């Protein structure tokens, strides 16, 4: 039992550190030599990378951030499907999945490498959803894309998707740990967007493709 608990703690630490890899921050440093937290919306997420560094960089950051969530859940499944580590109780699998999912999401938004700052955890949460249930992920993504099609406001689309994911999870009758993740991650994404909510209510939230203040010259950046 002690060995199993230590293994679980190690998994939580590993997935937190995985989530903490500051993809958007590194992109800013490598491409323009800037701290992206000082530009645009100050976030290290893909939306601010798009506005600050351009589309190719944003696509790369988005893909890597999604892969963080995918790999966190995949790591748990790999341990349960193999015999290369001490066996963990089968009853723990879904709850351990919940644990690593929360850890990787927190790592993305509260990176130890950035003094506990970071992105808003939307992309990493989506990566987790793809591993929990493909229909859950596709339904949530469809909600996001529908809202962004009509409003062109990324933050509003993320907030609506964070609410909708709970209804989709309930409709799919997912296990309690998965329902817990959709609720906790959904609430967390909304909280992370609190300043965006203020701007939405004031009618000042920038739309996709609009310029924002404090965006550096991208001349020469692909």
From Swiss-Prot:
Answer whether the UniProt record assigns the keyword Glycosyltransferase to this protein: no
NCBIfam families hit by this protein: glycerol-3-phosphate 1-O-acyltransferase PlsY (TIGR00023)
PANTHER family reported in the protein's UniProt record:
GLYCEROL-3-PHOSPHATE ACYLTRANSFERASE-RELATED, INNER MEMBRANE PROTEIN YGIH
Q: Which reaction does it catalyse?
A: an acyl phosphate + sn-glycerol 3-phosphate = a 1-acyl-sn-glycero-3-phosphate + phosphate
- Subunit record text: Probably interacts with PlsX.
Q: Which family does it belong to?
A: Belongs to the PlsY family.
- Per the record, the coiled-coil ranges are none
At the top of the EC hierarchy, this enzyme's class is transferase
- What organism is recorded for this protein? Synechocystis sp. (strain ATCC 27184 / PCC 6803 / Kazusa)
Gene Ontology MF term list: acyl-phosphate glycerol-3-phosphate acyltransferase activity
SMART domains, per database record? G3P_acyltransf
What the protein does comes down to:
Catalyzes the transfer of an acyl group from acyl-phosphate (acyl-PO(4)) to glycerol-3-phosphate (G3P) to form lysophosphatidic acid (LPA). This enzyme utilizes acyl-phosphate as fatty acyl donor, but not acyl-CoA or acyl-ACP.
The protein's name in its UniProt record: Glycerol-3-phosphate acyltransferase
EC numbers listed for it are 2.3.1.275
Q: Which UniProt keywords apply?
A: Cell inner membrane, Cell membrane, Lipid biosynthesis, Lipid metabolism, Membrane, Phospholipid biosynthesis, Phospholipid metabolism, Transferase, Transmembrane, Transmembrane helix
Where are the membrane-spanning stretches? 4-24, 56-76, 87-107, 130-150, 153-173, 174-191
Membrane topology of this protein: Multi-pass membrane protein
Q: In which pathway does it act?
A: Lipid metabolism; phospholipid metabolism
> GO CC: one term?
plasma membrane
InterPro entries from the UniProt entry: G3P_acylTferase_PlsY
Q: Which GO terms describe its biological process?
A: phospholipid biosynthetic process
Q: Where in the cell is it found?
A: Cell inner membrane
Q: Name one Pfam family in it.
A: G3P_acyltransf
